[in-house]
Amino acid sequence: MAAALLLCAAPIASAAPGTAEGRPPAHGGAPLYISDYADNVVLRLPPGGAPATVAASGLTRPTGMALDSSGDLYIADTGNNRVVVVPGDGGPQTVVPAAGLSRPIGLALNADGDLYIADSFNDRVVKIPADGSGQVTVPTNGLLHPNGLALDGTGNLYVADFVNDRVVKVPADGGPQTTVPFTALSQPTGLAFDRRGDLFVSDSGNDRVLRLPADGGPQRVVPASGLNSPYGLAFGPAGALYIADFNNDRVVEVPVRGGQRTVPVAGLHTPAGLAVPPGREGY
């Protein structure tokens, strides 16, 4: 678990979205989900509406999230060593049948509905196939407290290897693991791809977010100021990048055309994970 994650709790408060200038919600035309780590809740911020608490029961220190095409929300219930599913149709919460988890954090779903879980304290990534064939351990080498996960357009898996200060790529075809060419990473956490295939990582130990172009160009620093242990990442439908600014108790929006603003949700306490519906991300 990232050193930034604080073992404390506080009551949640919410505020109507919008800004002092009367602009619409920063997240555009799709809901934004935020896991509030210290308050043990997940919030849903709809376009043009007020934030509401997702009906997930018994959460302790929620972190990573993923949404499937049916609107089902997967939540890494880190403190309870499990992953829960909140159905999009309002049905009862269920627990993913994953055995032996210890501090699960990052989640990712592939096009077939298979779920990947960063089983952090077990130093592994596990896969729960959608066909019910049973849990498997993804073949990786040397992971230490894996954190964020992401999948590219061809199904390759990327893992933020937190203690080893690197991001690794696990090819979908079973080829050998490689290290992604980021430089000077410190405690990487969240991962996300934009629609161009550029890979973004929360470089939490350096209080910044990095971007690695898909065309092989050099890494760049995302122009977001004042970050303190950034965590989860997500893209909105208009291409804006959203950053869970963990130790600043806020979510930051970085629009495609530049600038920065704080997403209007009051009362956050160490936001960790972010998610938007599939197919609504990117540029």
Predicted regions mapped to residue ranges:
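Secretory targeting and sorting signals
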Residues: 1-17
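Short loop/turn segments that connect beta-strands within beta-propeller blades
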Residues: 45-50, 86-91, 128-133, 170-175, ...
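A short loop-to-beta-strand structural motif that recurs across blades of beta-propeller domains
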Residues: 40-44, 81-85, 123-127, 165-169, ...
